[in-house]
Amino acid sequence: MVEDFSDLAEVVPGLIIDKAIGSGASYSMRGVGSYGVGAAVVGSLVVNMNGHEYGSSALAEIGFHDLERIEVLKGPQGTLSGRNAVQGLVNIVSARPTSEWSGSFDVAAGNYNSTRSNLMLNMPFSDRIGARLSYSMFERDGTIENVYTGNDIDGRDAYGIRLSVDFDISETTKLEFTHDRSETEDNRQNIGIIVCAPHPVFGCSPFERGTFGQSADTRGSTASIFNFIAGLNSTADYNSYEGINALGSLEKVNINRDPEHHQVFEFTMLELNHDISDELQLVVKGTYSTRDYYHMGDNDYNVAVSPFPGLFPPGHPAAAIPMQWTGCFGGEGYGFCEIVDSDRTYEFAVVESETRQLEATLISNLDGPINFVA
């Protein structure tokens, strides 16, 4: 059963999907991918719902529920889907109301107290008006132990709800309304666990596989230079992560703070279909969507055991004086404050977006070899 994008990648040859740095997800279709991160970076694969852009990052959070079909088009689709559809297009078509009262409910349970449930109600109020309500929920305890905090992380707590209403205004005109909302509030990891063999020049050696949970050597990164300039170290030749507890496990991590992950996404579409004649159809779509996203992750993947020595070299009496202060991370309205006495690296992503789409399409159904979409 295809329940989310990872399942879709298993059944569609050439499609690779993974979480990306920042607030997004990375996609590759037939070896073509776009992995840049930034406000000016646009993806090269378009993810639509009912023909309008839904947002690949938002859909990667909750997965699929109550769909009619999933369309995967490989290769450039710019003629109908815009300049960003260089890799291809994934179009999610939601199930519409039908003419009979019906409903369904299913629950799947697994280890780590995993529960996934789906509910659907189809409600034909009259011959001309029908509605369909669907709800999906996924909860799971954390599968990775953070030995530093003592908590389990990488859990799931997400739900999605969709309301679809169809109104047959006349025999030639139909109005379709769709409102979709999803929300996540959990401690899932943004990317995963580091594998590194420390190297004083490269940070992590490109010639060795390394160990799970081993942080990079700060001498091989700009961190050592910044620490020296800031007076936190007496030299740039100082590795803050020497002697750390590298667990070498996929089931355990040793990081300063547990991840945080929050998202609320709403998508509202109104579509008008009107048959002008037997040969011409007019389709007008309008969409409004919002996304409120935040996550925090510990990006040095371990806890530095060597405190900042300051400008005094190791062994100097003054170097024994603890160097610490209260540092605040994440910006106003987000993040946290904590006592800082050693190296640490946190990644934050905050996204507040609002999108409007409007489209009018004229579709022909002419007798003969030529038809058009305008």
Spans of features found by a protein language model:
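Periplasmic plug
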Residues: I17-A20, S26-P76
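Transmembrane beta-strands of outer-membrane beta-barrel proteins
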Residues: G103-F105, A131-L133, L175-F177, L282-V284, ...
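Face-selective signature of the C-terminal outer-membrane beta-barrel domain
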Residues: V264-D292, S342-A374
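Residue-level signature of outer-membrane beta-barrel architecture
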Residues: M49-G51, K74, M123, V165-D168, ...
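Structural signature of outer-membrane beta-barrel domains
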Residues: S34, G110-Y112, F138-G142, S182-R188, ...
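Transmembrane beta-barrel architecture of outer-membrane proteins
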Residues: G24, S44, M49, Q87, ...
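Outer-membrane beta-barrel translocator/receptor signature
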Residues: V42-S44, S56, H65-K74, T79-I161, ...
